[in-house]
Curated annotation (Swiss-Prot):
Top EC class, one word: hydrolase
The keyword Coiled coil is assigned to this record: yes
Pfam families: AEP_C962R, D5_N, PriCT_2
Name of protein: Putative helicase 121R
InterPro entries tied to this protein: AEP_C962R (IPR056443), Helicase_SF3_DNA-vir (IPR014015), P-loop_NTPase (IPR027417), Phage/plasmid_primase_P4_C (IPR014818), PriCT_2 (IPR014819), Viral_Helicase-Primase_Cplx (IPR051620)
Location of the SF3 helicase domain: 609-791
Single GO MF annotation: hydrolase activity, acting on acid anhydrides
Lineage, highest ranks first: Viruses, Varidnaviria, Bamfordvirae, Nucleocytoviricota, Megaviricetes
Annotated binding of ATP, by residue: G653, N654, G655, N656, N657, G658, K659, S660
Similarity-based family: Belongs to the IIV-6 184L family.
Region (Disordered): 492-514
Keywords in alphabetical order: ATP-binding, Coiled coil, Helicase, Hydrolase, Nucleotide-binding
């Protein structure tokens, strides 16, 4: 088994992306592997020898779009006192039931498959001994029709349901239903295996289980057949389309090949449909490749020619690395619009790899059109040029210089100069700059940007461009010198000996005419070069070239795409992709312009010094382990854009409990470009579409951390504004002095955080609002040494810790921030994997829920008013008219909230009172309450 596993590891092709695999390892060493056609023979030689030696193997094949008809009859029964006989006999079916199931399959084929022949009905039955699995006795068998291949979707949606109907209606000779002693619905035992991997012959699901073995081969008439007789009717083929030799002597040994579910060179039948299905050969797999056609065909051909030249300069080692190999493929796919010429270029370049597999290239190419067009189409010539520049800048520059006539052919210098086009105007010079810096610079509505290898950074001065102008000028000066040498050389050689014969004079005359023509052309080129040099070295004319560069480098979608991908976040040294959960180099197509303030250090571990210091810090901030775990579980979402859980987090405590230090740690990690502190007015005032709101404008551009701090005692949060900021919907965005027509909406990507000692009142909150709120209590207290308990155990019990006055030093904060970034990514990856496989569950700690319940009670404005203004007596003779209550409520509200006017009218207030105290429409007063005279006294004071 280890030998087979190592074989797959060694031959596993780079050409198969993670979703593309052909075989699955089960048992103690699970995994998915891709087996290329070229490794097919070597694999079966090894596999057959292991099966023949009865070595436990656990390998299954992935089913293709075209599959043989397979049957899996899985019988099991719980063993108790009533059916103890079964435990003793260990028999759940007999030969009669087996033959009956085969007949149901064959009858279904006859009724639903088009143009079937007798050999299509040949069925291989595979069985193994019954076994106990806990309280259950399990037994069953597999069926395999080696000559009958059908479209998988039609097997799933047509054949299997028909078989189940046939099994349900079938009656044995005694009149009993199939498996009547086990279940009244025998069709339930027929499993649909079209979406499952199929065990190879000789393999089992785990090392401790026995494999299924051939017990019988049935003909179309249910007559037993010899193995050689059954497998010699039609030829079988390897994945390389070579015929397999079947003899009486070797038929048992090569059963794993004969019972493979590979569809190569198999005859595929239709299921009651006139549509003709083609045999899936390699040629068939290539049928989707398109020819170059359409209005842009000339542009496509030109780009493909350039791409072919650039691939000659590109480092061939990239063909061995999957990500860059796939990127080059998608680049060529986009350049060539998926045409066959583009594929041919990619296929040839892929052959530089030692792991080259033409089958994988075809399959991956055909899958590329399934990619998200928003992100795949933006990889084109610019991305290819970037790759080449990274690998061979000198070679790329030489290629561009040659394209634009900056390199002379010394072997045929005169002809080369005469054909030379000197760039004396803005347009060709701008095109040259585009070829040199495409993918590295871009001009957008927001100005110039340059790509630094990780992000796009704004550029104020195009210094590189002006330096390049000087470089081109130097090239032209060298050409001017060579032209002068040619002209003077011709003049020196123009004389002829007067004594030459007439034939030589005739030849000399024609050479002088040709030389004169060349001299005229050379002089014209000389003047053009002088004009080009003057243009390239003059500041004013350089500006004209740069203006034309703005036209060629302009990308109208750049500003809209910038920082709009919520699944990408840039560290200082690369990009983390939350779709693939991997850290990688930045790409131009990431369209990121901001980085976190830290580097991602994947060398850190749980035992690293800075990570241990972080764990110690968090354990003091949150002594309660459940609160700490919940805090980290929620806060790890900070890097992923958006607020998919729709949570508003409140950090609260009485002071000196670490809120500010924790916030500073997060600001150090995230950085000023991706974290902003906002005015509390954003939450206390209604967000008005169309009105200028500079605070909201600050949240654009992929901001990940929005903090509301320094709350006033009388400020109230509007639940509507809170819902808008946490709902994930687009927000109106208009800056000061910006025209309404220039404003635009944006989708927020930040996590909302409120930091306060006392929670501000939440106004008009509904259940949906409360569902979003998470109150994180900061319970610790950081005190001076004289107030701090001596032992660590006592400190944690009392939640009193020594105040570390040095923790906010820059180097300490940066070290903790780097560890925090690594830790949050680690937690997010673990959490996301659970989300994707459906096992993620979050438990909100009781302390967090209790804090929210207390907050809800505080925000009940009517309860707050009644508590301060009235006394509950439970005496029904005591009553307060609604009119008097409303007058008192208005006065109380103005005094309690710094002169703010009441937003409830009288009718709304009375309705709120009736709903809270379950009163009817006929009630005009609230009974059981009386005026609190202490409230009057406090007002007088």
């Amino acid at each position: 088994m280890n030998q087979l596993y190592s074989f797959f590891k060694n031959c596993n092709s780079f050409g198969a992306p993670p979703p593309l695999y052909t075989h699955v390892f089960l048992g103690s060493r699970p995994g998915k592997f891709y087996l290329s056609a070229s490794s097919d023979n070597e694999f079966y030689t090894l596999y057959n020898s292991l099966v023949e030696a009865k070595t436990p193997v656990c390998v299954a094949e992935k089913q293709d779009d075209y599959v043989p008809l397979l049957g899996d009859v899985d019988l099991k029964v719980c063993i108790d006192q009533e059916n103890a006989f079964l435990k003793k006999t260990r028999v759940l079916y007999g030969e009669e039931e087996l033959r009956a199931i085969v007949k149901c399959f064959q009858d279904t084929i006859k009724k639903n498959v088009v143009d079937w022949r007798d050999y299509h009905l040949i069925c291989v039955a595979l069985e193994k001994k019954p076994y106990m699995a806990g309280e259950y006795l399990k037994n069953g068998f597999h069926l395999h029709f080696p000559y009958l291949y059908l479209e998988k979707e039609k097997v799933k949606n047509v054949i299997i349901p028909k078989i189940k109907e046939m099994v349900a209606a079938f009656r044995l000779g005694s009149g009993k239903r199939l498996f009547a002693d086990i279940d009244d619905a025998p069709e339930n035992f027929i499993d649909d295996v079209t979406n499952k991997c199929w065990l190879m012959y000789g393999s089992s699901k785990s090392e401790d289980k026995k494999p299924y073995r051939i017990s019988q081969v049935y003909s179309g008439n249910l007559e037993p057949m010899d193995l050689y007789e059954a497998f010699s009717i039609k030829p079988f083929y390897t994945k390389e389309e070579e015929p397999i030799t079947v003899t009486v002597d070797n038929v048992k040994k090569i059963l794993p090949q004969l019972l493979s579910i590979s569809s190569i060179k198999k005859e595929v039948l239709n299921v009651k449909t006139p549509m003709d299905l083609k045999i899936p050969t390699k040629i068939y797999l290539k049928q989707e490749l398109k020819d170059i056609e359409g209005e842009n065909s000339e542009t496509i051909k030109r780009n493909l020619k350039d791409a072919k030249d650039l691939l000659k300069i590109l480092n061939k080692k990239r063909a061995n690395e999957y990500n860059s190999w796939w990127d080059i493929g998608i680049i060529l796919f986009n350049i060539g619009h998926g045409c066959e010429d583009a594929f041919t270029i990619w296929d040839k370049w892929s052959s530089y790899s030692d792991k080259y597999d033409p089958d994988a290239c075809v399959q991956v190419w055909n899958s590329m059109h399934l990619r998200n067009p928003r992100f795949s189409k933006i990889k084109g010539m610019g991305s290819l040029r970037w790759y080449v520049k990274q690998d061979n800048l000198k070679g790329y520059t030489a290629w561009v210089d040659k394209m634009h006539g900056l390199v002379l052919d010394e072997k045929n210098l005169v002809e080369c100069v005469t054909r030379l086009e000197i760039m004396t105007t803005d347009t060709p010079l701008a095109r040259l700059m585009l070829d040199l810096y495409s993918g590295e610079y871009v001009f957008s509505d927001a100005g110039w940007y340059s790509f630094n290898g990780t992000i796009w950074s704004p550029v104020k001065v195009l210094k590189d461009f002006r330096v390049k102008f000087e470089h081109i000028s130097t090239k032209y000066k060298e050409m001017r010198k060579r032209i002068m040498e040619l002209i003077y050389h011709k003049n020196d050689d123009s004389g002829r000996d007067s004594e030459e014969d007439s034939q030589e004079e005739e030849v000399s005359s024609s050479q002088e005419q040709l030389s004169a023509k060349h001299r005229a052309i050379l002089m014209a080129k000389y003047r053009d070069i002088n004009r080009a040099i003057n243009k390239l070295e003059n500041f004013a004319t350089q500006n004209g070239i740069l203006k034309m560069c703005e036209v060629f480098f302009y990308n109208e979608d750049f500003s809209d795409l910038l920082d709009e991908n919520p699944l990408l976040i840039a560290f200082k040294n690369g990009v983390f992709d939350f779709e693939t959960l991997t850290f990688r180099k930045g790409l131009q197509s990431d369209y990121l312009s901001k980085t976190l303030n830290i580097r991602y250090d994947d060398t850190l571990t749980d035992d690293s010094e800075e990570v241990l210091e972080l764990y110690n810090f968090l354990s003091k901030i949150f002594p309660d382990e459940k609160v700490r775990a919940y805090f980290v579980d929620q806060i790890c979402e900070v890097f992923r854009g958006g607020n998919r859980d729709k949570i508003a987090m409140f950090w609260t405590g009485n002071g000196n409990n670490g809120k500010s230090v924790t916030q500073r740690l997060f600001e150090t990690m995230i950085g000023k470009k991706l974290a902003v502190k906002l005015s509390t007015s954003v939450l206390t005032e209604r967000i008005q579409p169309g009105q200028p709101n500079p605070q909201l404008t600050r949240l654009r551009g992929g901001i990940r951390w929005g903090v509301f701090d320094e709350w006033g005692k009388t400020e109230q949060i509007l639940s509507g504004s809170l819902n808008v900021l946490t709902g994930g919907d687009s927000l109106p965005c208009r800056d000061l002095f910006q025209k309404g027509s220039d404003s635009s909406d944006f989708t927020p990507m930040f996590k909302l955080l409120c930091i306060c000692n006392e929670l501000p009142c939440l106004k008009d909150a509904v259940d949906a609002t409360w569902d979003r709120i998470r109150i994180i209590p900061f319970e610790s207290k950081f005190v001076a040494r004289e107030k701090c308990p001596e032992t660590e155990q006592e400190q944690r019990e009392k939640k009193l810790f020594l105040c570390d006055t040095e923790i906010t030093q820059k180097d300490r904060m940066e070290s903790l921030a780097r560890a925090l970034g690594w830790y949050l990514v680690k937690i997010f990856k673990e959490k996301e994997k659970k989300r994707r496989n459906g096992t993620y569950q979050v438990t909100i700690p009781d302390k967090v829920n209790d804090a929210k319940l207390k907050y809800q009670a505080k925000c009940d404005i009517l309860a707050f008013f009644m508590e301060e203004t009235y006394l509950k007596t439970d005496n029904q003779d005591h009553k307060i008219p609604f009119d008097d209550m409303y007058i008192s409520f208005k006065n109380w509200y103005i005094n309690s909230f710094s002169g703010k006017m009441v937003t409830l009218n009288k009718h709304e207030f009375i309705e709120m009172v009736r709903n809270k105290y379950n009163l009817t429409e006929t009630d005009k007063a609230l009974r059981g309450y009386m005026w609190n005279r202490n409230y009057d006294d406090s007002d007088d004071e």
